[in-house]
Amino acid sequence: MSDRYIDFANSSIGHRLVGALGLPSPVRLERWQAGRLRPVEGALLIGGGPLAARVSAFANRLTDGIYRYGEQPAAASEWIPGHGPKLKAVVFDASELQHTDQLKQLREFFQPLMKNLEHSAHLVILGRAPESLSDPFASSAQRALEGFSRSLAKELRSGGTLQLIYVGDGAEDQLEGPLRFFLSPKSAFVSGQVIRLTACATPVTDWTRPLAGRKALVTGAARGIGASIAETLARDGADVILLDVPPAKTDLDALAARLGGRSITLDICAEDAGAQLIEQLPDGLDILVHNAGITRDKTLANMTPEFWDAVLAVNLNAPQVLTKALLDSGTLHDNARVILLASISGIAGNRGQTNYAASKAGLIGLAQAWAPTLLERGISINAVAPGFIETQMTAHIPFGLREAGRRMSSLGQGGLPQDVAEAVAWLAQPGTGAFTGQALRVCGQSVLGA
């Protein structure tokens, strides 16, 4: 539904009034549009340590306007504060900051940029995982990056975002995929996140259609976020298979026909659901997206056994059982991608949602637990945790709660189903095997669970 407050805050009268009263002033976020060719449309600034040179090697595939601030990379044009162009994207390599005294480089690099960023600018800091370092001082310095990045993300204005990527040993050559996502409008509603990359050798041959030839199954696909995920996967070249309950067959069939895919109606909680699904997937799967989910909200004092059991069965048990069946049967191919739709409620909790929050936290735990084993087959498994997303469900939330949900993030607004779909589509790419066992929040840096 339309966010009328954003419309008002960005009108000439509303902008002045909001500023005078000190109210939140969210802006319309720039999102990926059909026909766009490059991740960054504007100036990209690269600086910092040796990983900056790695980024420089493929930066011309991200944008034409490449600038440097500091010594790295020498091939780029020098950016001069106050004289260079406004910046659309920034990458800073902080991986060699190994002592408290060196942390001042963060202030020295970023302070001059703060008033020179374009609308919806995207910033990324590169580091090394603190737990991988033997020197306590170096580990402390790298851990400090998290506090800095999350705080700076909250200071960005005009729809800006910032992420911290910890680059593991052997993952230095895996940066293009993550930067294509996090420096582009595809990550418009992702901010303040800490990402860990491990070594991965699966390449992407076509960045315009990275999912070409891959078969993708999306559950709960008839409408809402599930439908948006199916549309986005199809846009990126996947052969989509849409699954939902029998009562949703009409909408499901129509969407499948529009996307050139096919539909499956199935009760995923049925005792033989796994066997039925395997039978309908003779060619196997490369991408599995567990989006199907329900809510049955009550405080625990008033929670009925039926409400509890239904939510846990659909949201958690079904993904567990179906994924295991697809793995054991070989239906899920090697180098496949499994994405579980969790929720910010599974991280922060939510009053009246003990059943729902438990189910979504369980999905995050499932991704963490299964990741090491599945990595042996080249399979990655991750959770996506949406925050407040504008859907039919949130449209029925009482006005006061809905407005609070929208404003309680650094970006000051709710996300769109497209935002969740873009995150899923990125995680579905062959080249994202370096990212596994993690939960990616799509929440605009919500204050909940921060």
Question: Where are these predicted regions, by residue range?
Answer:
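Conserved glycine-rich Rossmann-like NAD(P)H-binding loop of the short-chain dehydrogenase/reductase
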Residues: 63-72, 238-253
